[in-house]
């Protein structure tokens, strides 16, 4: 396609080289902008891809520490923000491209319909003109036979470019359609500019002035034709009355030859005038009939053209709807994939959080268990050391002496020792401890 395009451009005549160079420059700018945008998108996607790879690598070696979990959370938030930003940017770009595409399609369809209208309009108008010209002699339709208002209207059409005001039929019909929709209010200008992208506001305003004058002259033309028809009908009735009167009047023979000659001459003049008036009336009627036939054929052609345009618009709408539906399905599919990836990443994040939490819990339990075991072992070792010390103290070779059970203990002997008075005064009473009942009556050995 590129080779065919370049060969087509460079094989053209030198008269169109300027336009071709402008198109080529515009194309180079568009290519450069597409490359720049592609590089930017690839850079963003590469950054997101690298972040996802880093996250996957981190998830392979999970560490149950708060710092590690916080690091994973920050990485996932960064990836999610990057994906959301990328989606929002692409959505805005996509909407802008859709608007530009719709505008371009409208302009292309309008230009295409204009070209079709020109081709069909020229051929059909030429056929109709030839058919009417073959039926009506040219010398029969003269300006002198038409009313002044009709001549003014025809002159206005010739000077301003016909019934469309130098516009093509498609643009003029859209202008009239929108104007009738708004009933001639000034607010219809904006909608006309939307329907006619190739026209400026000044051109639309000038056409509106022309159309107002066109309607006024056309109304005057209709009124003058109606008045002219009424006058012609009255003249026709007078001529018929004179003719009937002349036919019914008996021919009088006068004696004088001059009177008869004058009377005949007057009758011939009246008849000649009546015939000429009748011929003029017939020629005017014929021209009016031909004009009405031409107008009817134009109306039929306009109806057919409108029907073709309607079918073409329906086809464009159907194609646009199909394309839009495909693009919407593709967008939904991509959005679903991105959402599923985000959900999987969220699940992996939650799983990593749960794993780290379980590992922390298990590690805490393990530490408690180890501490408990260590405490038990320490307690056991201390007990063994204490028992060993006691054994060292207690283990003596003592002979058995059953009689020692009945001997007083060292403490008892110390208690029974006589202790002299320590005070300066006489000791009157020394309190003694109570003797248990089971020892009462037992003689104390000295």
Swiss-Prot record:
Organism field: Homo sapiens
Keywords linked to the UniProt accession: Coiled coil, Cytoplasm, Cytoskeleton
Region entry Disordered, spans: 253-272, 390-430
Main location: cytoplasm
Coiled coil: 35-116, 219-400
One CC-aspect GO term: centriolar satellite
Bias type Basic and acidic residues, positions: 255-268
Name of the protein: Coiled-coil domain-containing protein 112
Cell location: Cytoplasm, Cytoskeleton, Microtubule organizing center, Centrosome, Centriolar satellite
Disulfide bonds: none
Highest taxon in the source lineage: Eukaryota
Gene it is expressed from: CCDC112
